[in-house]
């Protein structure tokens, strides 16, 4: 079972709460996904008013753990300030830390990310950093005190799936004691299964479910994909080969097939 800081869960699927056709569909999709952790944006909910209260009521009804994020922040100062506001609003020291460097790719500002993570951890936060698949960046985040690291599969909302499989595998091999979550870029349940097959502890996604023709059915499909991927990893996947290997044994071949 995946462990996030001092809390253990059963689901390996974390899910976002944005972009759904309606609040009711959001609730149904989250239930169908089996997710126990949902991400929420402070910027969305801090807008205040009745809409924010109604959204928070829907989330409470789901009986899930809330992971606030700093989505949209483009500087260390902005991310740190947003994280502190989120702690006050949601009553949790958990924060999904995002510091964005580029508006087109939404690529993380890895230098600012490490700096912000260091500041927040010293202030008592438990940080879930959204980063690239770069090993040196992940290592710096771990050295700063992060016990969870969340590398992307591909740019947010791209639905491309895992672009750099070798780099993600290297992260898993080099950080065996860190909870690793593939975050962003997953577009199909098979992408989630692939991440879990690599030994990742969980995946986080939003758009692939929220923008599906049937978000509830897609959420269920991702749940099954995660289950399949983790089961395959635990069962032990065979190594890929460059050449064919017969699956039918030669022993017991009928005599008329024997070569003279």
From Swiss-Prot:
Species of provenance: Bradyrhizobium sp. (strain BTAi1 / ATCC BAA-1182)
Molecular-function GO term, any one: thiazole synthase activity
HAMAP family: ThiG
UniProt keyword Transferase, yes or no: yes
A biological process from GO: thiamine diphosphate biosynthetic process
A Pfam cross-reference name: ThiG
Complex formation: Homotetramer. Forms heterodimers with either ThiH or ThiS.
First-listed, main subcellular location of the protein, grouped into a coarse class: cytoplasm
EC number: 2.8.1.10
Protein name per UniProt: Thiazole synthase
CDD domains for the chain: ThiG
Biochemical pathway: Cofactor biosynthesis; thiamine diphosphate biosynthesis
EC supergroup of this enzyme: transferase
SUPFAM superfamilies: ThiG-like
Family, per entry: Belongs to the ThiG family.
One Gene Ontology term, aspect cellular component: cytoplasm
Function field: Catalyzes the rearrangement of 1-deoxy-D-xylulose 5-phosphate (DXP) to produce the thiazole phosphate moiety of thiamine. Sulfur is provided by the thiocarboxylate moiety of the carrier protein ThiS. In vitro, sulfur can be provided by H(2)S.
Catalysed conversion reaction: [ThiS sulfur-carrier protein]-C-terminal-Gly-aminoethanethioate + 2-iminoacetate + 1-deoxy-D-xylulose 5-phosphate = [ThiS sulfur-carrier protein]-C-terminal Gly-Gly + 2-[(2R,5Z)-2-carboxy-4-methylthiazol-5(2H)-ylidene]ethyl phosphate + 2 H2O + H(+)
Residues forming the catalytic site: 96
UniProtKB keywords: Cytoplasm, Schiff base, Thiamine biosynthesis, Transferase
Binding-site residues for 1-deoxy-D-xylulose 5-phosphate, renumbered to this chain: 157, 184-185, 206-207
Localization (cell): Cytoplasm
